[in-house]
Amino acid sequence: MYALLEAIEARARANRARVAMGIRDPNHKTLESAWKAQELGYAQVVLVGSKKEIDKIGTGLEVIDTEDPEKVLSDLLVSRKVDAVIRGTAKASGTLSSLKKALGMKRICRLALLLTADGTPFFLAPVGIDEGNTISDKLRMITLGAEHIRRLGVEPAVGVLSGGRMGDIGRDRRVDRTLADGEFITGRALELGINTKHYTILIEDAVKESNFIIAPDGISGNLIFRTVAFLGGGDGLGAPVLMDDYVFVDTSRVGGHFTKAIMLASALSHLNKERKKVIH
């Protein structure tokens, strides 16, 4: 897995995709991280937001002037005027609803890529607060996520989490339900040929032994993401939406660092181009 980041960086530099980034309430830190991605050769970065506000801070990057970056990001992606999009600091609800509308999708699945404080990378799902609330949702995330992870040259090892240890059965009905769900999901994923283990509540063991963590639901997944990236000294590279024809990497507005998310988007765009060559 440690070689994963090197592979992503190499693909980004080989591709140097045109990547659009949503901007609201711009600040120096945000714009500097976008400029750094272009300077390092990861992508040609296009900022999408209020030019007036962006120019107050200053940037050497291309700017598409709009007061509605949430909608324009999806328009740029669907029209293929850019190779990939990252949400940047655009609003989450508006951006994702515009994306679903533009692509005719009822639901989306996101797969976050995180680094622990010691630099260990792992994938995480679900990460949206309204995602992964049913067994079928989580199984869909496992199958889609495993497929996308393999495209990066990594064999997925799935670690399923639940709300307690097996010895806790009987203490709480909700905990019992998550444990039963964890056992069922693990068994079904194994039947589908995906290397999967139920780690109960022991996330520390799951991260050591697995590279794709499945949280009990989207709320706990979002909390794991925020704890690792914003409190635990780790980092979040972004959360790509799992789809074949387009590249959209969701990001959090909190951190302010978008260099690696742009790198990831450019690399995924490169993988998409390679896959389409093979198909055709």
UniProtKB/Swiss-Prot annotation:
For biological process, the GO terms are: methylation
| Keyword Methyltransferase assigned | yes
Enzyme Commission designation: 2.1.1.-
Report the GO molecular function annotations: methyltransferase activity
Q: Read off the SUPFAM superfamilies from this record.
A: Isocitrate/Isopropylmalate dehydrogenase-like
Its family remark reads: Belongs to the MtxX family.
**Subunit-structure text:** May be part of a complex composed of 3 subunits; MtxA, MtxH and MtxX.
Q: Can you name this protein?
A: Putative methyltransferase mtx subunit X
